[in-house]
Amino acid sequence: MDHYLKKLQDIYKKLEGHPFLFSPSKTNEKEFITLLNQALASTQLYRSIQQLFLTMYKLDPIGFVNYIKASKQEYLCLLINPKLVTKFLKITSFKIYINFRLKTFYISPNKYNNFYIAPSEEKANHLLKEEKTWAKIVEEGGEES
């Protein structure tokens, strides 16, 4: 197993609660970003994801930077949750997920920002609902209708 991916898995195992509620304060944020960047560059899958991110950045640099700053916990979950990683072996599935995330929040920046400062219970309920929607999209092999 890739060394950096293993380190990310170790961090993940130490986190409590729902995987999507990862808080950078629970680990060293600088170390997390370093590990994330190394993992993104370490295998073909992550290079593909990195290429997708670069494409998104070229399309809308400001929007992309805002998106990734607010979404670090999601990328950690995608990288080290084995069930999710198997679903993203095809880059098209990952693109569908990114499109889903952008449609969910980026279309409405205020709603997006408000979500990230919402009370934990409200956030947890929303994410659980969203996770079910995403699971359905993956199962059906298409985009949200």
UniProtKB/Swiss-Prot annotation:
Q: What induces it?
A: Expressed in the late phase of the viral replicative cycle.
UniProt keyword annotations, A-Z: Late protein, Virion
| Superkingdom to which the source organism belongs | Viruses
Q: Where in the cell is it found?
A: Virion
GO CC annotation:
virion component
Q: Which family does it belong to?
A: Belongs to the asfivirus K145R family.
Q: What is this protein called?
A: Uncharacterized protein K145R
